Structure formats: C-alpha cells, structure tokens
UniProtKB/Swiss-Prot annotation:
Similarity comment: Belongs to the YbaB/EbfC family.
PANTHER family: NUCLEOID-ASSOCIATED PROTEIN YBAB (PTHR33449:SF1)
Subunit structure: Homodimer.
Keyword DNA-binding: yes
Record key words, sorted: Cytoplasm, DNA-binding
GO molecular-function terms, A-Z: DNA binding
Domain of life of the organism encoding this protein: Bacteria
Biological role stated in the UniProt entry: Binds to DNA and alters its conformation. May be involved in regulation of gene expression, nucleoid organization and DNA protection.
Source organism of this protein record: Janthinobacterium sp. (strain Marseille) (Minibacterium massiliensis)
Record localization: Cytoplasm, Nucleoid
One cellular component (GO) term of this entry: bacterial nucleoid
Protein name: Nucleoid-associated protein mma_2329
C-alpha cells in the first residue's frame, strides 16, 4: 500500500511540475501596466518582470528631472506589484490542494 501511495504522490508532483511550467510560460505573455502621476507615466511589463514599454507624457519633459525620475520609479514599482499579484493569482490554481505552509512562496 505504501508503494502505491508513493507512486501516486510522484505522479501528482510530476503533473504539478508540468502545470507550473505551462503557467510560467503563460505568465511571460501576460502584460500589466503600472502608472504614476495620474497616468502621466506608464510602465508596461510582463509578469516575468520584463519591461516592454515606458510612456512619458510630453508635458513632463519640460519639468523637473528629479520629479520625472521619481514618477518613472513609482510607475515601475506599481507594475512590479501588479505583476506579482497576477502571478500569485495564476499560480494559486496550480498549487491548490498542496499542503504548503502559510506564507510559502513558490520560486516564480
């Protein structure tokens, strides 16, 4: 009986690993947008944290350089938070039913 349980567990682990790989591939194609300055600065990135585009409203180009740098950083951080939230949401379906400790983060 123990051998059958172990074989079942190994099969389940392999299926979960395959599902996680598929989900990670999908996350690379999902894009999120971070914004700051009421949408004057936008950063679009994949859920794998690859920045795709940065948009800066022309009205900001004549303004203070330090303020513009702060807005770009804030938009980037907003995009990172959205990418992390989307990744966790998508991966939660893959890890559902696994006895993971509270707060355990999968490596993705």
């Amino acid at each position: 009986m123990m051998k059958n349980q172990l074989a079942g567990l190994m099969k389940q682990a392999q299926a979960m690993q395959d599902n996680m790989k598929k989900m990670q591939d999908q996350l690379a194609s999902i894009e999120v947008e971070g914004q700051s300055g009421a949408g004057l600065v936008k950063v679009v990135m994949s859920c794998k944290n690859d920045v795709k585009r940065v948009s800066i409203d022309p009205s900001l180009l004549a303004d203070d350089k330090d303020m513009l740098e702060d807005l770009v950083a804030a938009a980037f951080n907003d995009a990172v938070r959205k990418a992390e939230a989307t990744s966790q949401e998508k991966m939660s379906g893959v890890t559902a039913g696994m006895p993971l400790p509270p707060g355990f983060k999968m490596p993705f």
